[in-house]
């Protein structure tokens, strides 16, 4: 059984450290969770996520907004090698992707995160390879030391843009709660 802790989604303006507060909302408890590829729109050519749904992919939970953009990713991390999907990594962010963007995993492949569009967004290469990666290393080290790691990533967007403007990354390692806000550059 998957136990997921959640926190409030208040954005930290320019701060990179804060303390999340407990919230009882749990995507895993939703009665309507899409699974096994049901999160994609049928017959639209290029795969796109359905709007306003909660879905499970590789043991992690996600929520989309009214435009089919990933708004929340969450779960209890585990060390497990996932698969990379170069095709989907190049598509993440669609027409709003910037030249220096990568297709960044919200839940890294070292934690068994999906390599498909259901876990990828356009992410500035410095954010992806340095800032976000530093947080992932802390999670990886905690797991290797036998600690539990629970994460919730809330994505910010402007208007109808498919490229996130930032990531509110909230996590608990053991009993320690942390929150950072990463601007998506560009």
Regions found by a protein language model. Give the residues of each.
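Domain-level detector of nuclease and nuclease-like folds
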Residues: 46-48, 52-186
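Long, low-complexity, intrinsically disordered regions
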Residues: 1-53
């Amino acid at each position: 059984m998957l136990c997921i802790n959640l926190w409030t989604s208040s954005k930290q303006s320019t701060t990179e450290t804060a303390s999340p507060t407990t919230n009882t909302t749990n995507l895993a408890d939703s009665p309507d969770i899409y699974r096994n590829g049901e999160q994609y729109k049928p017959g639209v050519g290029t795969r796109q996520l359905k709007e306003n749904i909660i879905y499970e992919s590789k043991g992690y939970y996600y929520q989309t907004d009214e435009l089919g953009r990933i708004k929340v990713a969450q779960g209890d991390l585990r060390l497990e090698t996932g698969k990379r999907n170069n095709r989907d990594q190049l598509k993440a962010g669609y027409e709003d992707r910037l030249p220096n963007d990568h297709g960044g995993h919200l839940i890294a492949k070292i934690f068994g995160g999906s390599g498909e569009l259901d876990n990828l967004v356009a992410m500035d290469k410095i954010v992806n390879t340095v800032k976000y990666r530093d947080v992932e290393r802390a999670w990886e080290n905690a797991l290797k030391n036998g600690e539990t790691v629970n994460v919730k990533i809330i994505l910010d967007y402007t208007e109808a843009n498919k490229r996130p403007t930032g990531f509110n990354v909230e996590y608990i390692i053991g009993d320690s709660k942390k929150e950072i806000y990463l601007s998506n550059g560009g």
